[in-house]
Amino acid sequence: MKKKLHPILKKIPLVCATCKKQHVIDTTVENIHIEICANCHPFYVGKQNFTTVAGRVDKFNKRYQNKVK
């Protein structure tokens, strides 16, 4: 059999950016970044989490609401 054929697996901590929960996985890469995991994803949790980010129209209205009055 050939030696050094298979990549070396190592355990790395994987931290969710949303809920900050840490998962340990086996992988060949050095680091992995995830934005959302199964613990906080609305599909798996069963409820909607709204993170309100102002859209372009909201930013425009907020900027010019004092000038109209």
From Swiss-Prot:
GO terms for cellular component: ribonucleoprotein complex; ribosome. GO terms for molecular function: rRNA binding; structural constituent of ribosome. This is Large ribosomal subunit protein bL31. Keywords: Ribonucleoprotein, Ribosomal protein, RNA-binding, rRNA-binding. It comes from the Bacteria. SUPFAM superfamilies: L28p-like. Binds the 23S rRNA. The lineage of its organism: Bacteria, Bacillati, Mycoplasmatota, Mollicutes, Acholeplasmatales. It comes from Phytoplasma mali (strain AT). InterPro entries: Ribosomal_bL28/bL31-like_sf (IPR034704), Ribosomal_bL31 (IPR002150), Ribosomal_bL31_A (IPR027491), Ribosomal_bL31_sf (IPR042105). Part of the 50S ribosomal subunit. It holds the Pfam family Ribosomal_L31. GO terms for biological process: translation. HAMAP family: Ribosomal_bL31_1. Belongs to the bacterial ribosomal protein bL31 family. Type A subfamily.
